[in-house]
Amino acid sequence: MMRRLMLVGAFVFVATTGQAAEAIEGNWKTASGETAIIAECGGAYCVTLKTGQHAGKQIGRLAGSDGRYTGEITDPAADKTYSGSGAVDGNSLKMKGCVLKVLCKSQTWTRL
């Protein structure tokens, strides 16, 4: 149950070393082995599962710019929504999801 909690976070901080922000858009392999796509949708970024039991379900929505995004993610198995944080670093997306901002877990997704 908790492994899906971290699917996508609320803040995506991108390392700023004078380079352009790393894109969050694309296909990602989740920690549980499913494939998710993060794509632009209506001025935000939507997270949709492409594989697994909940394939086709939108499980998150992020808004923001300049490498910082806020949003929510839903655990499709429990039908609960969480907030969190994350960071894109090359081909890795480190996610941290929290309940009431105190009970947090993290996981890393890999860009496909």
Where do the model's predicted regions map?
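Short, exposed beta-strand-loop hairpins at the edges of beta-sheets
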Residues: 85-106
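Positively charged n-region of N-terminal signal peptides that target proteins for export
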Residues: 1-4
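Central antiparallel beta-sheet cores of small beta-barrel/beta-sandwich binding domains
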Residues: 22-85
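Sec/Tat signal peptide C-region and signal peptidase I cleavage site
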Residues: 13-21
